[in-house]
Amino acid sequence: MVKDVSPDEVAAEMSKRKLLFVDCWAPWCNPCLALAPILDELDQKYADNEDVGFLKVNTQIHVQFAIDNNITGIPCVLLYVDGKPAQIEIEAEGNAEPFTLDRLIGLRPAEHYEFIISKVMGTETD
């Protein structure tokens, strides 16, 4: 199960992981509640991988964390790589310009998180 932590615990964990997912959620948010089992399953899957971690921060309790991280909607999963906010380059389809990703917003399937993990860990397949 993904551990619900304080912002201080997020800061401490960032330096320990190559890739850290931080789920910004609130107990009244139905999409947040629907995302929880997806992240719990991924957390279990990667439990033995010290490079990948999952945490969650209750934005109803830790309002300043949400403000500091420009959280304007939830669920919002912040991405940290090597202890810093992520800057993951994503190739867009068609003629669209590539873009940089630092968070996943909304209810997303496990495959989206798996894609980020493979991209950051260098295990992408074409």
Task: Describe each region flagged by the PLM.
Residues M1-A12, Y113:
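N-terminal "domain-start" segment that seeds a small globular fold
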Residues A12-E13, F65, I116:
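CheY-like receiver
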Residues S15-P27:
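Short active-site neighborhood of thiol/selenol oxidoreductases, capturing the structured segment around
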Residues L20, G53, C76-Y80:
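Beta-strand cores of modular interaction/reader domains in eukaryotic scaffold and signaling proteins
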Residues D68-T72:
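A short glycine-leucine-enriched loop at secondary-structure breakpoints
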Residues G73, L79-D126:
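Non-catalytic, surface beta->alpha helical segment in thiol-disulfide oxidoreductase systems
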